[in-house]
Amino acid sequence: REQGVRMKLSAVSSIVSGKKVVMIDDSIVRGTTSKRIVRHLKDAGAKEVHVRIASPAIKFPCFYGVDTSTLEELISNKMSVDELCEYIEADSLAFISEEGLHKSIHFDHQKCGLCMSCFNGNYVTNLYDSFDKANKFEK
């Protein structure tokens, strides 16, 4: 996975050198991509790298189609925002809140069933008798 990230992403020194950079990504799942991009930007001379994530922190497995079936592989489940910021070597890190996500898409989640289970652990269907059993699920 890290080699794939290395091959498809690079930073242009003439653009980022000496600058404060804000990197925006859709999510952080395992942390591999964010860590690598921050490193590329700093190696290219970025003065600071601030990371903003356009989803709430993914703390719970998704059983509805996304390939994250255990808590262990979800970095936001294992680390606080400050710890994750340090791990990816960013100067700052922030996630959009659940409420902020709803507002950004003009969505009333009370009236419609937007699945937020990977963010808050409230699954829309009863998959297992307990969350402990769900966490042992392996694809």
Question: Predicted segment positions?
Answer:
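PRPP-associated nucleotide enzymes
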Residues: 1-139
